[in-house]
Curated annotation (Swiss-Prot):
Keywords: Carbohydrate metabolism, Cytoplasm, Isomerase, Magnesium, Metal-binding, Xylose metabolism. PROSITE patterns: XYLOSE_ISOMERASE (PS51415). Gene3D superfamilies: Divalent-metal-dependent TIM barrel enzymes. The lineage of its organism: Bacteria, Pseudomonadati, Pseudomonadota, Gammaproteobacteria, Enterobacterales. This is Xylose isomerase. It catalyses: alpha-D-xylose = alpha-D-xylulofuranose. Mg(2+) 2 binds at residues 268, 271, 307, 309. The keyword Metal-binding applies. One of its GO terms (biological process) is rhamnose catabolic process. InterPro entries: Xyl_isomerase-like_sf, Xylose_isom_bac, Xylose_isomerase. It comes from Salmonella typhimurium (strain LT2 / SGSC1412 / ATCC 700720). GO terms for cellular component: cytoplasm. Homotetramer. The active site is at 101, 104. Binds 2 magnesium ions per subunit.
Length: 440
């Protein structure tokens, strides 16, 4: 078979001095960082949808890319051609993982029977590709938002027959993920939200999606899937308001339906931007709540109110993200999936490599800086000092429930408490972070 990326053998590490745009300058898979291989820290994945399914179309224009597998033809054969190119790309990019939606890899067909038959054939194709290339599946998911049947959502749809169709897709995609050795299964909100409250029963829709997620958990245990279930928060788009708005909202939902021990979160940087949060905030919140799972590494544009899905290029932003992840013990089943796409004007097929290479170097350099922050320990020391009072007698009595509100008020009066504010030293800490970032 003719190689699609025929001008490239494989992307390799050449070091910081390299000017080769098709080489890594910072990502060295075998380099040890805090005693662990860089590849094992970062667990990079490339996504199927933006990389091989998007044709460059947007709201104002038709497809701009001339991909051979996006031409008219027999759908299943084109899907197999797309898989050939995808795994050529994964291998040459040197990523250990990939991710997909069901209909990214397989034609949907005109019925559930066709959908399942097509998907079963393509799962066999993907299994063979994985065996041949050594590339593994980080996570799979089902696209329950593109087809017009999902215009009013999938699990939150007012029609239980649509709910049932979505359940069929999710079961099939979960089974496929399990068969392919996937390490996680993702549930993104899609169109689980509302356009207007005038035709929406919020309590009803919340009960529906809560039951749907409980059924997903039940099926996971029934099938013996050992991977992690992940919800991906997003505040809006495509609906006006999504029910999985941000990490904290998802945690409240999980608690309500008794799922907080069963499901974690897959955090996307651009979705944090849309929610009015920093990427750092969402990562730290998930870790604090015990539901951190995986990351969709990309970036948004603070001046635009939609999901631009650009490749991450900010070491300043991502060093702090990697710092939080390292302090929490790193990824277990999760990783860094590049949910990012080249720009519509980037029509050269090698632009796909340029985008991913830059992103991988960004995250690798961020990891190394984060490791220096962990090794130095100065930030942690200053935070510990700020909260040191809570390790004292009074602080511990409060936290252990040994003082009531009235007793605490009495204590304050008896001891003539007159606390004085202590500086938070924000500027000092920002300067400290800059030293890690820019001092060699």
């Amino acid at each position: 078979m003719q190689a699609y990326f025929d001008q490239l053998d494989r992307v390799r590490y050449e070091g910081p001095q390299s000017t080769n745009p098709l080489a890594f300058r910072h990502y060295n898979p075998d380099e040890l960082v805090l005693g662990k291989r860089m590849e094992d820290h970062l667990r990079f994945a490339a996504c199927y949808w933006h990389t091989f399914c998007w044709n460059g179309a947007d709201m104002f224009g038709v497809g701009a890319f001339n991909r051979p597998w996006q031409q008219p033809g027999e759908a299943l054969e084109l899907a197999k051609r797309k898989a050939d190119v995808a795994f050529e790309f994964f291998h040459k990019l040197n990523v250990p993982f990939y991710c997909f939606h069901d209909v990214d890899v397989s034609p949907e067909g005109a019925s559930l029977k066709e959908y399942k038959n097509n998907f079963a054939q393509m799962v066999d194709v993907l299994a063979a590709k994985q065996e041949q290339s050594g590339v593994k599946l980080l996570w799979g998911t089902a696209n329950c938002f593109t087809n017009p049947r999902y215009g009013a959502g999938a699990a939150t749809n007012p029609d239980p027959e649509v709910f049932s169709w979505a359940a069929t897709q999710v079961v099939t995609a979960m089974n496929a993920t399990h068969k392919l050795g996937g390490e996680n299964y993702v549930l993104w909100g899609g169109r689980e939200g509302y356009e207007t409250l005038l035709n929406t029963d919020l309590r009803q829709e919340r009960e529906q999606i809560g039951r749907f997620m409980q059924m997903v958990v039940e099926h996971k245990h029934k099938m013996g899937f050992q991977g992690t279930l992940l919800i991906e928060p997003k505040p809006q788009e495509p609906t006006k308001h999504q029910y999985d708005y941000d990490v904290a909202t998802v945690y409240g939902f999980l608690k309500q339906f008794g799922l907080e021990k069963e499901i974690k979160v897959n955090i996307e940087a651009n979705h944090a931007t849309l929610a009015g949060h920093s990427f750092h905030h969402e990562i730290a919140t998930a870790i604090a709540l015990g539901i951190f799972g995986s990351v969709d590494a990309n970036r948004g544009d603070a001046q635009l109110g939609w999901d631009t899905d650009q490749f991450p290029i900010s070491v300043e932003e991502n060093a702090l993200v990697m710092y939080e992840i390292l302090k929490a013990g790193g990824f277990t089943t999760g990783g860094l999936n590049f949910d990012a796409k080249v720009r519509r004007q980037s029509t050269d097929k090698y632009d796909l490599f340029y985008g991913h290479i830059g992103a991988m170097d960004t995250m690798a350099l961020s990891l190394k800086i984060a490791a220096r922050m962990v090794e130095d320990g100065e930030l942690d020391k200053r935070v510990a000092k700020r909260y040191a009072g809570w390790n004292g007698e009074l602080g511990q009595q409060i936290l252990k429930g040994q003082l009531s509100l009235g007793e605490l008020a009495q204590y304050a009066e008896q001891h003539n408490l007159a606390p004085v504010h202590q500086s938070g030293h924000q500027e000092l800490l920002e300067n400290l972070v800059n030293r890690y970032l820019f001092d060699k």
